[in-house]
Amino acid sequence: MKERILTSLIAAFVITSLQAQTTPAVPRLVVGLTIDQLRSDYIEAFSALYGERGFKRLMREGRVYCNAEYDFINIDRSSAVASIYTGTTPYYNGIVGNRWMDRASLRIIKSVDDPAYMGVYTSESTSPQHLLVSTLSDELMVATCGNAEVYSIAPTREMAVLAAGHAAKGAFWLNDETGKWSGSTYYGSFPEWVTTYNDRDGLDFRIGNLVWGPYLPVTSYKYVTSDAKQLTFKHDFSDERTEKYKKFKTSPYANDEVNKLVDACLTYTNVGKDNVPDLLTLSYYAGNYAHMSNAEYAMEIQDMYVRLDNSIGDLLDLIDRKVGLNNTLFFITSTGYTDVDPKDPEQYKIPGGEFHIKRCGALLNMYLMAIYGPGQYVETYYDRQIYLNHKLIEDKKLNLTEILNRSSDFIVQMSGVRSAYSSQRLLLGAWTPRIDKIRNTFNPHLSGDIYIEVMPGWSVVDEYSQVTKVVRDNYSSAPLIFIGNNIKPEILYTPVKMATIASTIAHFMRIRAPNAATAAPLTGIRK
């Protein structure tokens, strides 16, 4: 009997020891790189132009999901980054876009505005106050009792702050007016190593000498069809009158600036230097220059990917040299949208037209006055959304549900409108895959009372924001790539959800997932 018990104990000990040996260690560092407007099809299309250290290394050594998808529509930088690091949609995390209408003041606010905190090296007052749930960085700080090193570095303010979350030790972005790395007093005292970088190596000392031209011979750039015949291109950033820093942030050199500050961070902080896991959230840019179309800048977008390939290679080498890629879990993904191309030339006879949201609001108000009497029933409008005057409706003791239904039925009769969804229909109505995506974009406290879905090919003219957008619902492929820390190399084309990133990383760091991240972690990623 004793021998049997002893044998069982030895067997249990051996099995436990083997499991401990085969369980991958917690990564010393996690690096998340979100590349604005990165496209899987462009990565593949321009592959003949790449070296061996960037995309090709990712394809050889990484686990590559070629079709990663967001569970909501109207994606932009803010909503995408918030979704990645919270593991949920705008319906829960509160970040419905870069900007939205504030119901109380009827003014447009930006996703990271907060007058309660002062900017550092910037006049912009910033915090993540609009982010309503926890992020991956928040959960790491809680799990390590604040001992983890968590920093966020990005060309743009919203990408830096929303990736940093509420509890990071710092979020840094390039100032649109000075080129200095900026921050917010929300994150406490501004690090001395960033101040030193600004004083000694700041972009403002070098930008006048930077010129963006083709990295390769111009005959190499033949992978984007365009009517515009480009012989070459040349962009400099020396003219003070042309918002040079904003344009710089849409060039590939912005990615190199991120790498420079990452190098300083790894040199002057404790990131990756002890057994407490740390987190760096980074952002790059991969859209077209000055947010113009590929038709205008076909050569630039190809050169952008060539230089992006170099920047990724430099970053991988930097992490490998300073921390060790085997000690690092590195993931790369995209914001999943692209800047909208202009209206198609009329000669091709593609159906379309113009939908004016201001006219829509005015006509709707006239219609409601004809039924319910005088009054300003439409309070305002913004980004294909109508905001009704709830106080007036309450004062008149009218039925809100009836007004919402009448309004939706009226708007859907307008030219160019495919559907009109009331807030009640989105919250309480029947489920369809399309309604689910729209609902995930919607937030009851921020969004309008009626969401208008405009036909593809039509231009939405928003007089309030002075922006005209062509509606295009075509699929845009976005990648999700893992590399380092025992990652199993494989290329997969099965669609995966971006919402799985936060729970997957949390699983491998052995911490809680963010508090609204309900998706299960991806499996089979590590050896």
Task: Pin down the residues of each PLM region.
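Bacterial Sec-dependent N-terminal signal peptides
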Residues: 1-26
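Loop/turn elements at helix/coil->beta-strand transitions in domains of secreted/extracellular proteins
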Residues: 26-31, 61-66, 92, 145-150, ...
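Beta-strand elements within well-structured catalytic alpha/beta cores of enzymes
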Residues: 27-39, 58, 84, 140, ...
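Second-shell loop/turn segments in exported
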Residues: 39-45, 68-71, 121-128, 245-252, ...
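Short, structured active-site-proximal loop/turn typified by the sulfatase FGly-forming signature C/S-X-P-X-R
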Residues: 43-92, 149-153
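Secreted, luminal/periplasmic, and some membrane-associated catalytic domains
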Residues: 67, 76, 98-123, 133, ...
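His/Asp/Glu-rich, glycine-adjacent segments
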Residues: 89, 97-276, 285-292, 413-415, ...
